[in-house]
Amino acid sequence: RTEQMTADLSFKKYDLLSIIRQALRKYSRLFILQKIKLNLEEMDYSVITDEKWLLFALEQILSNALKYTKEGSISIYMSKEKTETLVIEDTGIGISPEDLPRVAEKGFTGYNGRDHKKSTGLGLYLSKEILGKLNHKLELESEVGVGTKVLINLGRLQN
């Protein structure tokens, strides 16, 4: 699927917050049902991207955050330390240090995916592949029992 998408890419200038809100709308019911608090930082950035594919990647990342966060919150904000970097941070179960380097590999589910029997091992893989084709970069930071931060360097942000 990611091989075919290159011909489908349409780069334009989009409002980042608008794309984030679209992704959140898809999961609004789950936030309510699971009683997960959403902390969405107001932001005024435009990003050069393909809206459809960035939206797809954000939806995959939010799906994972909701899947592995039983209580607490999901926060979406711009990094203070890393320029042009969007952060999606959850208070979920976290990813073990031995699984962290491999979670974006195709088909890799790690301990959490096997333990929760909900993982295909494709969500983060597809997100990383798609973001790469969009000239964005995905990084992960995680601590077991504390949560996970997904950092997306969007590059070429304008405000």
Sequence positions of predicted segments:
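Conserved micro-motifs of the catalytic ATP-binding
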Residues: 4-9, 42, 46-49
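A conserved beta-strand-to-alpha-helix junction within the catalytic ATP-binding
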Residues: 10-28
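Short beta-strand/loop element within the Bergerat-fold HATPase_c
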Residues: 73-83
